[in-house]
A protein has these predicted regions:
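Periplasmic N-terminal accessory/gating domains of Gram-negative outer-membrane beta-barrel systems
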Residues: 1-31, 39-73, 80
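Short beta-strands and strand-coil junctions in structured, solvent-facing domains, enriched
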Residues: 14, 32, 42-43, 71-75, ...
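Short strand-turn segments of transmembrane beta-barrel domains in outer membranes
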Residues: 94-163, 207
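Outer-membrane beta-barrel architecture
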Residues: 24, 66, 83-85, 159-161, ...
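Flexible, solvent-exposed coil segments and beta strand-coil junctions
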Residues: 45-46, 62, 132-141, 194-204, ...
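Outer-membrane beta-barrel translocator domains and adjoining extracellular loop/strand segments
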Residues: 110-115, 187-194, 245-253, 259
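Short aromatic-centered micro-motifs
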Residues: 35
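Transmembrane beta-barrel wall of Gram-negative outer-membrane proteins
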Residues: 141-247
Length: 262
């Protein structure tokens, strides 16, 4: 188990389907579930979905994950499947420093040409320079995709923290910070077929889709315990996600005309 998504699939009634974002709870998908972080609702990084991707949350930032499949007064009212609550990690002990690195590749596609869009850097940030003259602009980015010959999935992470003791009562004050970067490549052979209600086929295409997903996550935690009677904790989380894809398809697509061959 390397992230929150893998953790919740170990719970009875929770499953994951390849190619589909997030998990199913008792057969109910994204629109029926809710995701919270330390009890607070989380927005999705993708406007097409209700829930944030659980694979953003690696085990290095998770203290525990809870799955509540029953209605309760403290939960969201629009949940028919489950509420998934992610509890962030706090510093244990006097200090901590850790590094992580991982990689992977698909031996069947590593030697093949992988098509990429132009316009983003290694960190997944795009060129957002606005033209001074809207009537004339020399675009830096090319519409033609570039070919990459070695696709290596990679992930880096760093975490660290320190505990101090404040005042004559030596109340513990701890700081914890973790950050990570992930790059993931996906290649799929696709068949796309659509018909009208009368059964007329208006789209029949075969092709390949190349997708690159780049994301960063940073989490900071400050925790103060006053004489074991009062507890104050503050968490700050930042997520950046960039998804780009290139599709190369051949076949029939007659959405905008009676008979169009692509």
């Amino acid at each position: 188990v390397s992230d929150a998504e893998g953790a919740v699939t170990k719970v009875a009634g929770v499953s994951k389907q390849d190619g589909v974002k997030n998990v199913f709870v008792r057969g109910l998908g994204d629109r029926y579930n809710a995701t919270t972080f330390n009890g607070f609702a989380l927005p999705s990084e993708d406007p097409e979905y209700k829930n944030i991707s659980l694979d953003f949350f690696g085990t290095d930032i998770i203290q525990s994950v809870g799955v509540n499949k029953a209605f309760n007064a403290g939960g969201s009212s629009d949940v028919g499947g489950a509420t998934i609550d992610i509890v962030s990690k706090e510093l244990i002990g006097s200090g901590h420093l850790g590094f992580g690195i991982s990689g992977g590749l698909n031996t069947q596609t590593v030697a093949a040409d992988f098509l990429k869009q132009d316009g983003v850097n290694f960190m997944g940030f795009a060129n957002r320079t606005e033209p001074a003259d809207e009537n004339s602009w020399n675009f830096r980015n090319k519409l033609d995709p570039s070919a990459q010959h070695l696709q290596i999935n990679r992930s880096y992470s760093i975490s660290g923290g320190k505990r101090f003791y404040v005042g004559k009562d030596k109340n513990p004050l701890s700081f914890f910070l973790t950050a990570g970067h992930t790059t993931d490549y996906q290649y799929t052979d696709e068949i796309i077929r659509n018909t009208t209600t009368s059964g007329t086929v208006y789209k029949d295409m075969n092709g390949k889709k190349y997708a690159e997903n780049i994301s960063q996550l940073a989490l900071a935690n400050v925790d103060f315990d006053m004489q074991n009677r009062h507890h104050i904790s503050y968490n700050l989380m930042m997520i950046h996600a960039n998804t780009q894809s290139v599709g190369d398809y051949n076949g029939k697509n007659s959405i905008f005309s009676d008979d169009y061959e692509n």
